Structure formats: structure tokens, C-alpha cells
A protein has these predicted regions:
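Internal helix-loop-helix
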Residues: 1-46, 88-91, 315
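Internal maturation/activation junctions in enzymes
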Residues: 1-4, 21, 32, 38-68, ...
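Glycine-rich phosphate/cofactor-binding loops in nucleotide/flavin-utilizing enzymes
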Residues: 3, 23, 293-343
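Flexible glycine/proline-rich, aromatic-decorated loop/lid segments
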Residues: 70, 135-165, 293-314, 319
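A short core secondary-structure module
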Residues: 77-124
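A glycine-rich, basic-preceded beta-loop-alpha segment at the flavin cofactor/substrate interface
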Residues: 120-123, 127, 139-171, 188-205, ...
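Extended amphipathic alpha-helical segments enriched in small hydrophobics
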Residues: 172-253, 336-343
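Charged, glycine-rich active-site and insertion segments that engage polyanionic ligands
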Residues: 261-294
Length: 343
């Protein structure tokens, strides 16, 4: 799935957002009741689109400040959502995972739960579609919830603490794949132009400065791709142990392995998000530089890549937040320990 994400992003990073959000089905599969799984998973498999409705006007990086209200209706036998969500990618999707405040009188993360909203039930209005710098292939919406019916996913009060954390880790893998795809696209565009553009009687790829830039672009793209695949491997092994634990008790050695790969997944996911998104911006910048004045024009794809890349080190957790998340693993020696294993 991650490899496919990368290939889709190489073609169009905006469309990859719609494609990548289908991974919301994994969250439903892992945490939702059997009834909800039977209702939504076949629909998503048949082509229903997904969204994760987390951000609000006053709750961006600080999701603990989410205030969209979920109230239980005894009369209707369902939860009713009221409030506003902002900057929601693919906000008009068919199935939405919504972070909402179910506990009266709370103002922190412990009052938040995860709910699933079905577009067919109504109650949500797209008030605005953002006019964005890039990733124009997917709509980014402001949503108004007015008594929108929704169903609880998993347990109350665990929305941010457990379910969104899992969802965000998967989303950050997706942004890693998206960033690597854009790095590859930028490198290919730059390489193609350098082989075709001639100045001073020779193709510009033969100039040492251009050749060095291309070599660095290739090396960084391959390096961050390796980080993407390795991080995905850590996450996948941890998830497999989790699935096994639902079927039978794990052996002592298996529990130790599960704990180990959970630590690696937690440590390498922010590292991947940080480096891949920053490299995507750098690769897009360098691609335009190699194109010269032509790269500033909309006639060439690198102009679009440059605009698309800019959001990658912002959404699903800014680079600064990834540094904060990684610091704990630096001090605990997670990265150093793994480097020694590679050696």
C-alpha cells in the first residue's frame, strides 16, 4: 500500500491524498465494532471515499483543544455532532472519522472520542473549499456539523489518546510515501531537463555544478525511500503481533518482539515524516533551480511540484512537532541502538 502511495504521489500529490485516506478503513478494522466493520468496510472496498475530521479553527497541532460536540440522543439512539471542522482533506468524503468531545465539562484530551459519520445520513455542510497554494487535486474543506448522526468507534474517551494516535501514525507513513513520490518526480524532471537543455555548446548535465545537484537529489531520494520502507516494516511487524494477540496469548518472546517493534515504529515514524517532507521541499526547489527561468513557469511540472511540496512539512504534524516526538527516542538511544544493529 505504501509503495502504491509513492507511485500515485509521483504522478499527482493531490490525488494521492484521496487515495491515501482510504487507509482510514484500517482504523475501522482495528478498533470499530463488528457491526460497523460490516457496514463500512465493504463500502470502502467498493470505492467509497474517506476523510479524517480532526482539525478545528482553534485546534490545529493541539488536538486536545477540539470542541466539536457529540451529544447522545436517547430519542434517536445515536450520537449527534455539532460544530465546525477546518482544513479537512477530502472533506466531502463518504465516510468520515470524526474527533469529537463526548464528555460534558471537559476541556482536554480525556473528553474526546472517535466517531464515524456516514455522508448518506446528512447533517454536514461544506461551507468552504479552500483556495490552496498546491495539492489542488484534493478538496480541503471547512465543514459545519448540525445534528449530524454518528456512531462511536471503540471506547469513549479514547479518541485522541489511542485512536487518533494510531490514525496519525498511519497518516504520517502516508505523507512519507507522498513526499518520496514527489522527490522522485522532482529528480526525474530535473534529470530530463538537464539532459535536454544545452548552453555554451553542451547539455547542462555536463556542468559539474548541475551534475552534483542531480547526484545529491538521487542520493537523498534513495535514502529517504529506504527510511520509508524500513519504517513501514517496523509498523507492519508490530501490527501483525497485535493481530495475533487478538487470536491467542503471545509467548514471552513474542511479547518482547512486539514491544521492540512498537518502540521502533514510534521512533522512526516522526523521523520519516520530518526528513521525507523536508527533502521533498528541497528536491522541488532544486528541480526549479536546474530548470532556471523556465522552472518558474507553469509550462513545466516542477512549478507544480514546488507548490505541492510546501504543505508536506506542515500537515499531519509540522516538522517542529516531529522533532519534539523524536527527542525522546534520541535521549533513550533508540536510533543509536538501531544504527549499531545495521552495522
Amino acid at each position: 500500500f505504501v509503495m502504491t502511495n509513492e507511485m500515485v504521489a509521483r504522478a499527482d500529490a493531490g490525488f494521492e491524498n484521496i487515495w491515501g485516506l482510504q487507509d482510514c478503513a484500517e482504523t475501522l478494522n482495528e478498533f470499530a465494532s463488528e457491526e460497523l466493520k460490516q457496514k463500512y468496510l465493504p463500502w470502502v472496498s467498493a470505492g467509497a471515499t474517506c476523510a479524517m475530521d480532526l482539525t478545528e479553527p482553534d485546534a490545529g497541532s493541539d488536538l486536545g483543544a477540539v470542541m466539536l460536540k457529540a451529544t447522545w440522543s436517547e430519542q434517536k439512539g445515536t450520537w449527534l455532532l455539532n460544530g465546525v471542522k477546518r482544513f479537512i482533506t477530502n472533506g466531502d468524503g463518504d465516510v468520515s472519522l470524526v474527533l469529537a468531545r463526548t464528555e460534558e465539562g471537559t476541556t482536554d484530551a480525556r473528553g474526546l472520542s472517535m466517531l464515524v459519520y456516514d455522508k448518506r445520513d446528512g447533517g454536514v455542510k461544506v461551507r468552504r473549499i479552500e483556495n490552496k497554494l498546491g495539492i489542488k487535486g484534493s478538496p480541503t474543506c471547512e465543514l459545519v456539523f448540525t445534528n449530524a448522526p454518528a456512531q462511536l468507534v471503540g471506547d469513549r474517551k479514547m479518541g485522541l489518546i489511542k485512536y487518533v494516535m494510531s490514525l496519525m501514525n498511519a497518516a504520517r507513513l502516508g505523507i512519507g510515501a507522498q513526499s518520496v513520490g514527489l522527490c522522485e518526480a522532482a529528480y526525474r524532471e530535473a534529470l530530463k531537463y538537464a539532459n535536454e537543455r544545452a548552453q555554451f555548446g553542451k547539455n547542462i548535465i555536463r556542468f559539474a555544478a548541475i551534475s552534483e545537484m542531480l547526484s545529491n537529489m538521487k542520493a537523498k531520494t534513495q535514502g529517504v525511500r529506504a527510511l520509508l520502507y524500513e519504517t513501514t516494516r517496523f509498523v507492519e511487524i508490530y501490527k501483525q503481533y497485535t493481530h495475533i494477540s487478538h487470536e491467542r496469548p503471545l509467548e514471552a518472546e513474542e511479547r518482547q518482539e512486539m514491544k521492540y517493534y512498537n518502540k521502533l515504529a514510534d521512533g522512526f515514524t516522526p523521523l520519516l515524516k520530518l526528513f521525507s517532507s523536508e527533502y521533498a521541499n528541497q528536491m522541488a526547489y532544486d528541480a526549479i533551480q536546474i530548470h532556471g527561468g523556465s522552472g518558474f513557469m507553469k509550462d513545466y511540472a516542477c512549478e507544480r511540484l514546488y507548490r505541492d511540496a510546501r504543505i508536506m512539512n506542515i500537515y499531519e504534524g509540522t516538522s517542529q512537532l516531529q522533532v519534539v516526538a523524536a527527542i525522546n527516542h534520541v535521549t533513550k538511544g533508540t536510533y543509536l541502538e538501531q544504527i549499531k544493529r545495521y552495522e
